[in-house]
Amino acid sequence: MGVAIIIVNHLRQVVTMLHEILPSYTAMPVVLISEGLALKPNHVFIIPEKRDLHIRDGVFRLEPISKPRGWPDVITVFMCSLAKHWKGKIIAVIVSGYDGDGADALCAIQDVGGITIAQKLDSAAHPDMPMSAIETGCIDFILAPEDIARQIIQLADG
């Protein structure tokens, strides 16, 4: 398929475990992002905890978290950086979660030709994030989780 999957999770307790859990579910290498790591196709990249993630010149840049109190906005920070600095295809997906992280960057993703997807509210355990995303008016697809996977494959192949 030739895609990189970047998981930006704003839950601090879970994120450090994802790089240990996900290899059981994918043949792609799963990597915890470090400063200066190059973005490569056919890899899954996981943001480390308590860091903002940026991309510049095809490499990941980590900075101290810019919002240390309340719900972090690490998804918004990364997607804004992606919209500004990435020249390839972008597919941004917002799934179940608290608060509205990511929503403020979706129109920027669309403005550079990216595709945006939100999880269907009735399939989300915590619909705040997909609801905030949908309310922006900058969502191309609203799908159940199993349909999100199929849509990503179709978009990546097309």
Regions found by a protein language model. Give the residues of each.
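Conserved acid/base catalytic micro-environments in cytosolic active-site loops
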Residues: M1-G158
